[in-house]
Amino acid sequence: MPVTARIDGLGELLDQQFSVVSRGQLLALGMKDTAMQWRVRAGGPWQALLPGVYFGLTGAPNLLQQEMAALLYAGPGSLITGPMALMHHGLRSQVMLETVDVLVPPGRQRLSTGFVRLHRTQRMPSRFVSSGPLRFVLEARAVADTVRLLTELRPK
C-alpha cells in the first residue's frame, strides 16, 4: 500500500477522537508503520503527541485533544482524574491545566511522559462519566485526587 493510500474508516475515527489516533488503531485499519512514519515526518501533515499516539493536524493540540491522546496512551480502562476531570464537572481548580492526570490499573506497563502523568491504582473506579470518547472519574474522586496532587506538588 502506498504511503498516501486512502484508509477506510480513518476519517471517521479522527472525527470521533478530536483528530487523535493511536498506532494500534491505525494498524487495525490496515495502515503500515511506514505510512505512519511518513505522515509524522518533519514537515508532514501529522505529528506524534506521545509514544504511539498521533495528531492528524499541524499546530498545537487543544485540551480535548491532549486528553484524548492521554487516554489512548494510557490504554483501555484508563480514566482522567484531577484538575482536568474537575474542569469537566464544572469545578475550577487553582492548578494549571498543563498536565493530564490519568488513572491506570496497577499492571499497566506505561510511564508518565510529556503532558501525561499516570497514577497506578488498585482501586480503579467502576463508575465514571463519559463525554464522547473521553472518560472521567466522578466528582468526589476528582476532588480527592486533586487535593492529593496539590499536597504532593507543594514546595517543601
Segments (PLM) and residue ranges:
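Short gly/ser-rich loop at a beta-strand->alpha-helix junction or flexible surface loop bordering the NTP-binding
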Residues: M1-K156
